[in-house]
Regions:
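Primarily the internal scaffold of c-type cytochrome electron-transfer domains
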Residues: 1-16, 20, 24-158, 162-186
Length: 186
C-alpha cells in the first residue's frame, strides 16, 4: 500500500491522537456486542466542551458510560500528570501520547457568552437559534426546548465533521434531490 490514510483536521493540528478522547472503553469495547458502533462509545463532545448553557461536568455521558460516568479529572497519563485539569476557569487537557503537550479546551458556554473573550456570534447563533423562524431569536434567553439545534436533539458532529461541508441538505435546497418536493437529504 503506497498511501496510508490519515485523519486530518483541527484536532490533529493540535497534536491530538484518538486516545486523547477515546479511552480503553471506546477502543476495546466492554466485552458486549453492540447493535451499532456508536453504542460502544463512552464519551461525548459535551463531556469536555460543555454546552451553550453549562460548563462541562468532565465526566463521560455517552451511550456506553456507566450511570455515574468516568470522571475525566481522575484520569492520569503515563507520566503521572492529570489528563484533564481545571486551572482557574480554564479546562486543560494533556496529551496521552506526547509528554509536555497540552491545550486549552474551548468551552461552548464561553463561546456563547457575550462578555467572554472567546465569544463567537456565529457559533452562538448556531447553538442557540430558536426554531421560530418568524422571530429568528438566538442567545441564552432562548429556552433549550425551543432551540433548533439543541444538544438534546442533535449530536455535535451532525455539523462538526469533515464530511459535513455545508448547510446544504438540512437548510438549503440541493440538486441531488431535485425531483422530490422537499429538496433535502432524508
Amino acid at each position: 500500500m503506497d498511501h496510508i490514510p490519515t485523519v486530518d483536521g483541527f484536532y490533529v493540528d493540535l497534536g491530538m491522537q484518538c486516545v486523547d478522547c477515546h479511552f480503553a472503553q471506546d477502543g476495546h469495547g466492554d466485552g458486549f456486542l453492540k447493535n451499532e458502533v456508536m453504542a460502544a462509545v463512552e464519551i461525548q463532545c459535551q463531556d469536555c466542551h460543555g454546552t451553550a448553557d453549562a460548563y462541562p461536568l468532565a465526566r463521560t455521558t455517552g451511550p456506553a458510560a456507566s450511570k455515574i460516568g468516568k470522571y475525566l479529572t481522575h484520569i492520569r497519563n503515563p507520566d503521572g500528570k492529570k489528563r484533564f485539569e481545571w486551572v482557574g476557569d480554564t479546562l486543560i487537557q494533556r496529551s496521552a501520547t506526547t509528554p509536555g503537550l497540552e491545550w486549552k479546551m474551548s468551552l461552548l458556554k464561553d463561546i456563547s457568552a457575550k462578555p467572554s473573550d472567546a465569544y463567537n456570534a456565529k457559533a452562538d447563533r448556531a447553538h442557540t437559534m430558536s426554531r421560530d423562524t418568524a422571530t429568528l431569536r438566538y442567545g441564552a434567553e432562548v429556552p433549550l426546548e425551543e432551540r433548533a439545534h439543541g444538544e438534546d436533539k442533535m449530536l455535535c458532529y451532525t455539523c462538526h465533521s469533515s464530511w459535513t461541508t455545508s448547510c446544504g441538505g438540512c437548510h438549503l435546497p440541493i440538486q441531488a434531490n431535485w425531483r422530490t418536493e422537499r429538496h433535502k437529504y432524508e
